[in-house]
């Protein structure tokens, strides 16, 4: 075995992505899902596919596991731990969910619940997710309540500068 092919040079990290999905309203709610294989309650998340962009993967996982369309808002953070003797890195994004479901939930999920932040933290089975949601949850809910920001449109390269409405054009 050459150094280039030895196990020490192979990235054995499991890369996963997910979201803290928030439904806005008078009382915002956070999605938690129950897996069928072990009945554990977790934040919606899953493995990143080969060559998949992490944001697309996170959106896909949340839609598959909750059945709700979501808008990805911002990156929130990372949880890292050992899973089956391999390092696992889970990246989370804040997502705004629509009011009603649009899709069927995947068969690996037996239940989806939209809970208050305190109830979601209490329901989670994974201690690392509990700590993560405790630390970032209030921020996520406040950010999810904000109205969407319009993206600034940049002028084309070489275009003249935009005139302000109060400037007069001289002939």
Report each predicted region and the residues it spans:
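Intrinsically disordered, low-complexity charged/polar segments
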Residues: 147-171
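A short, flexible beta-alpha/helix-coil linker loop
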Residues: 38-40, 120
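Unchanged
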Residues: 48-71, 75-135, 162-171
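Short, acidic/hydrophobic/Gly-rich beta-strand patch recurrent on exposed beta strands
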Residues: 32-34
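Acidic, metal-coordinating catalytic segment for phosphate/diphosphate chemistry
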Residues: 1-18, 24
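A short gly/proline-enriched turn/hairpin at secondary-structure junctions
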Residues: 42-45
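Short strand-connecting beta-turns/loops that link adjacent beta-strands
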Residues: 24-27, 36-38
